[in-house]
Regions:
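Structural signature of tandem alpha-helical TPR/SEL1-like repeats
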Residues: 165-171, 204-213
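Short coil/linker segments at helix-helix boundaries
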Residues: 26-151
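Short coil turns that delineate tetratricopeptide repeat
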Residues: 12-14, 68, 129, 181, ...
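Generic helix N-cap/helix-start motif at coil->alpha-helix transitions
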Residues: 96-101, 145-155, 185-195, 220-223
Length: 223
């Protein structure tokens, strides 16, 4: 980590996509080791497992950003780094499908850290929204958005509420309400989400928006 930390600041290497990929790969190897140990029934540090994923995702976002920056040969022809994205994509998909951040997020919540729990849950549900996934729709299609995905959004909003990160709580819960296709499949979560939104607006003194949030539940579930 010391060596790669230096490379991330070195003038000759800090703007190279591969430098940031390698930085993220360190966290990935920690994830991979922990994942193998878990499969073998060994105890693992779930918090460290989640932290390594968060770290590598951040590094790989930067790596992909740099991979999109062209370099030019002597003839002035633009060249792009196509290797780095191909290295990142399967690993990000693996993170999502293993729900590592969900496990680590619940651990954080149980340790009375709802703010960190929110960060981990929202990082998980945002994986399909990463630019690299959007630019490779065939890979993004492999990331399921079933009821579990929207349940994660609900919990992320709830954790943000408990962490008093109210703007993020509203945005996340509204996102769940807006994106899900089948309200009946998430009846309980939709009702609770609007109750959290209602409570936030009441605490902020905005009765108009508070009433609107409850009306949404009534309109969906008039019975």
């Amino acid at each position: 980590r010391v060596a790669i930390s230096d490379a991330l600041q070195d003038e000759e290497t800090k703007d190279q996509a591969n430098t940031w990929y390698v930085a993220g790969y360190i966290g990935y190897k920690e994830f991979d080791t922990n994942n193998l140990n878990r499969q073998m029934g060994r105890n693992i540090d779930v918090d460290a497992w989640g932290a390594s994923v968060m770290e590598s995702l951040n590094y790989w976002e930067k790596a992909y950003e740099l991979a999109l920056v062209p370099t030019y040969d002597k003839k002035g022809k633009a060249k792009y780094d196509t290797r780095t994205p191909k290295l990142i994509l399967p690993k990000v998909t693996e993170y999502y499908n293993n729900s590592v951040l969900i496990s680590a997020g619940f651990n954080a919540y149980e340790a009375n850290n709802p703010s960190l729990a929110y960060d981990m849950f929202i990082a998980h549900v945002n994986i399909p929204e990463l630019k690299i996934m959007q630019d490779y729709p065939e890979e993004a299609a492999k990331l399921l958005r079933d009821t579990s995905y929207y349940t994660c959004l609900y919990y992320a909003g709830r954790f943000a509420y408990e962490a008093e990160r109210y703007e993020e709580a509203i945005a996340t819960l509204e996102r769940m309400n807006t994106e899900h296709a089948n309200a009946n499949a998430l009846r309980k979560e939709v009702i609770y989400a609007n109750e959290y939104i209602y409570q936030i607006y009441i605490e902020q003194g905005d009765t108009v928006k508070a009433v609107e949030s409850i009306k949404k539940s009534i309109d969906l579930f008039p019975e």
